Amino acid sequence: MQPDSYPKILFGLTLLLVITAVISLGIGRYSLSVPQIGQILWAKATALEIDPVQQQVIFQVRLPRILTALCVGAGLALSGVVLQGIFRNPLVNPHIIGVTSGSAFGGTLAIFFGFSLYGLFTSTILFGFGTLALVFLFSFKFNQRSLLMLILIGMILSGLFSALVSLLQYISDTEEKLPSIVFWLMGSFATSNWEKLLFFFVPFLLCSSILLSLSWRLNLLSLDEKEAKALGVKMAPLRWLVIFLSGSLVACQVAISGSIGWVGLIIPHLSRMLVGANHQSLLPCTMLVGATYMLLVDNVARSLSDAEIPISILTALIGAPLFGVLVYKLKRGGMNE
């Protein structure tokens, strides 16, 4: 990437995101044209009278859903790219540390016992952070410097919680509880509102701000530990901080929209093709690409058929072939990340 091309790429991605978001306001059963959307937004900004139906559709249904999709997409993509950086492995994604499965079990447990919305949030977050604590505990117990051990612990916990989720599904009431559990696990923004958006936006803003401020340090994680230490950077604390922040993003995401896969794996690869591997430019680019991608997927989910398609189905259908194409191009170009 040429040094002067990064601002242009960033501006182009930002413009694409804004255009996609505006068009998304008009997509749905109650369709609106771009001029109509502009008139409604202008009327809202200038306190003019707005059609009650249009106001309800735009500001109470679609706008919080769009903003939630943007934040979730940016958060998952950011989590994926920083984890790939600290593990020095392009195949790592947020699921690898077990937080997704732990949070999913917490949410499934809440639905199984009929908890309220706040109970669902609390259970999901507690099990997500509990899983993260177990990863830290076992990693320190065995070998805190071994990245392989950390991955193995995450995989073990992920498998355990996935089995527990399956057990709860097996014993759930097939008339009421099971459909709710299955739909929630597949991921959706159908129930998005301002309350859920605020619940996710606060930790998203905090975690993403810290990770962006650490972007130059993330470049040092590609160095040997002795070389990084010579430069005055302590690898272990930085690595644990990044894992904690990434896990926090994932746990909060699962709480509001269920389990969504492939985003944290695919988007970092697409972003590297645009701006390279320097985390100072890669992180903002990845967040913009992730936000736009998630918004496009959600548009397809709510407009392709009368019944809304779960997000995780679409991300897998798009992500798996796309990842195959990326791997083929990397191999053909002789690249080896």
From Swiss-Prot:
GO terms under biological process: siderophore-dependent iron import into cell
InterPro entries, per database record: ABC_BtuC-like (IPR037294), ABC_transptr_permease_BtuC (IPR000522)
Residue ranges of the TM segments: 6-25, 52-87, 99-113, 117-140, 147-171, 194-214, 235-257, 265-275, 279-304, 311-329
Induction: Expression is repressed by molybdate.
Superkingdom, taxonomy of origin: Bacteria
GO MF annotation terms: transmembrane transporter activity
Subunit and partners: The complex is composed of two ATP-binding proteins (MolC), two transmembrane proteins (MolB) and a solute-binding protein (MolA).
Name of the protein in its database record: Molybdate import system permease protein MolB
Organism: Haemophilus influenzae (strain ATCC 51907 / DSM 11121 / KW20 / Rd)
